Amino acid sequence: MELTSQTTQVATTQAATTQQEHVRGVAAEHASRHARVIRSAKDGRLLSALMLPFFAVRPPSGYGVITTTGRRTGKTRRKCVRVIRRGERAYLVQLRPPVLALERPSAIAAWVWNIRANPNVRLRMRGGTFAGVARELTEPAELEQAREAMCDTVNLFDYGECDLHLRGLPTRAKIKELHGYWFDTGVPLVVELASQGLS
């Protein structure tokens, strides 16, 4: 029994190390194409705080506000996110900009830690506010569905996102490349939406 436990721990550690190496490799490949605007988790929090008043009123297509419960405080926490809805599922990704991914490839944002502690969330997006249950994606079939939704969908606001994060003029191809980078280095999640919206 103890040998099985040790074998499982070794396999888990090896998988985590392999994932971190993958994230670092992708980040190194893309780093030169990214602008240096968002370099840390603090920069991301600041950007989210600046967008929050606007997104809370009327989020643009492909974006929204996720509300989690703080794992330590129990208070509600809101974060602006890119979110793509497919039926009763909404896909989102925790981002790791290249500078962060190179330094800390396993970095987890506070809102993801909150979801791990309490997966019940509210999601404000086009179409209303929805209660839901969030979880990280690990199954290959679900990851492929999420990748298609997140990387192949381009909305008008994505051009501004691309202009902020990548060097040069934004194009549809560059937006898809940026979203592919976020997906490959980030933490993909799904929110299973309740059938009735809250508002």
What annotation goes with each model-predicted range?
Residues V57-R58, K75, K79, I84, ...:
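A generic structural signal for short, solvent-exposed coil/turn residues
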Residues A31-T76:
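Short, conserved active-site entrance elements at the starts or edges of catalytic domains
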Residues M1-S5, L198-S199:
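Membrane-interfacial terminal anchoring regions of lipid-handling membrane enzymes
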Residues E2-T4, R24-A28, S32:
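Short amphipathic, positively biased membrane-proximal segments
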Residues H22-G25, P97-K174, L178-V187, A194-G197:
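Short, structured beta-strand-loop surface elements
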Residues G64, V187-L189:
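Short beta-strand micro-motifs in enzyme catalytic cores
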Residues S61-V99:
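Short beta-strand segments
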Residues Q6-Q19:
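Compositionally biased, intrinsically disordered low-complexity segments enriched
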